[in-house]
């Protein structure tokens, strides 16, 4: 889990496109805090802080504290909008949470040991089916990423959720099927059976 942080914010007295454009001209981004059966709270946060938090990674899996006047509100960033042309943030949605909250969150998938994966060393291609996995997790213990070790995968293998060790109290939202996260695809012009034969030959040679 990434380290929590604090964002300073100001209440927005006005909402709408005109007000939002004015905020952005002055270095702020319009945002809203919602959830926990409370009325939505319209706020403005620093453009620079949000920009760096988003592009540093882990933005939507890290709990933050928003300081608004005398209030300190624990939140989880749930969504953000980017300018369609220039890719800078223009709006953020925050969900109210507590230390006891359990939330649905998209956790990124990270693959490691590509350099030792048998399938990739033989020219196979890592075909990522899911870059993120929708999970249910405690708000105060959301993992930064789901780590998958590729060192034992060969060409033709599939990586399913059932073989992934998730952190304690983290479960996938999808429970009715063993969905695929990634596969090791054969390179163009190669059949999976060719690689299987080569693997068997390697094993036989190792025994002699």
Swiss-Prot record:
The lineage of its organism: Bacteria, Pseudomonadati, Pseudomonadota, Alphaproteobacteria, Hyphomicrobiales. CDD domains: Ribosomal_L25_TL5_CTC. Pfam families: Ribosomal_L25p, Ribosomal_TL5_C. GO terms for cellular component: cytosolic large ribosomal subunit. NCBIfam families: bL25_bact_ctc, PRK05618.1-2, PRK05943.1. Part of the 50S ribosomal subunit; part of the 5S rRNA/L5/L18/L25 subcomplex. Contacts the 5S rRNA. Binds to the 5S rRNA independently of L5 and L18. Keywords: Ribonucleoprotein, Ribosomal protein, RNA-binding, rRNA-binding. GO terms for biological process: translation. This is one of the proteins that binds to the 5S RNA in the ribosome where it forms part of the central protuberance. PANTHER family: RIBOSOMAL PROTEIN L25/GLN-TRNA SYNTHETASE, ANTI-CODON-BINDING DOMAIN-CONTAINING PROTEIN, RIBOSOMAL PROTEIN L25_GLN-TRNA SYNTHETASE, ANTI-CODON-BINDING DOMAIN-CONTAINING PROTEIN. This is Large ribosomal subunit protein bL25. It comes from Bartonella quintana (strain Toulouse). Belongs to the bacterial ribosomal protein bL25 family. CTC subfamily. InterPro entries: Rbsml_bL25/Gln-tRNA_synth_N (IPR020056), Ribosomal_bL25/Gln-tRNA_synth (IPR011035), Ribosomal_bL25_b-dom (IPR020057), Ribosomal_bL25_C (IPR037121), Ribosomal_bL25_long (IPR001021), Ribosomal_L25_dom (IPR029751), Ribosomal_uL5_bac-type (IPR020930). It comes from the Bacteria. GO terms for molecular function: 5S rRNA binding; structural constituent of ribosome. Coiled coil: none annotated.
